[in-house]
Amino acid sequence: MRGIFSTGVLDAFYDHQYRPFDFCLGVSAGSTNLAAWLAHQRGRNYKVITDYSCRPQFISFKRFMLGRHWLDLDWLWEITIREVRLDLERFADQPIPLFVVTTKVADGQAAYIRATAQNLEHLLKASCSVPIVYRDFTVIDGEQMTDGGVADSIPVIKAYEMGARDITVILSRPDGYRKKRPRSPWLLRRILSKTPRLAEAMITRDMRYNRSIDFIENPPEGCRIRVIAPSNGFAVGRMTTDAAKLKAGYEMGLQAARSLF
């Protein structure tokens, strides 16, 4: 649900016709927001987050305790494709490449896959598939994939390696946030005993996240990084369904982006 902030940022970009980018890298909810923005669908993801994602058919701890999904992405993808589908034709017709970050279940490494009209919806589902709370893995090109945020939450170093020297980063945490190591790594290893490399990637996620923050705070010579992040008053967490908090998070994103103009 923290993706509501970048929803606001990108809707503001849309309002100002701000599209100066050579390419985009998206992770988890951020990838879905970028896809809607590139497809010129202002407001689409605001509805997805504040309506569909808040319904008990999608988010249910009781269902999780019964051995099923806490976050049912199968239901969410099916209903949003039916009722508020991304405009795949318009996405394909625009010139800015989108690379979606996923995590390979077999080895816990990041994959950066270029989105097309043919693979977009499947890629986005893979990148949003948070391990444990969504009990399945999405298969891309014969390989099981999961949440891109596990392997590379902030792909700023990858953007630099791809040649970017003027980089805009949209964060879902306040500026200065540092990720901490999980308190119970043994529990993750136990829950994910069938996928040990993925378990280790989740346990060491803080190292990669904080390395990206270090890169942002101390970019190489000749590299400019602009950060758009929520303020410390951002009250939206992964499971937030409170309408007022979600609306405030969206407005915060709108305002943060508008300050650029």
Predicted features and spans:
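Patatin-like phospholipase
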Residues: 1-27, 35-261
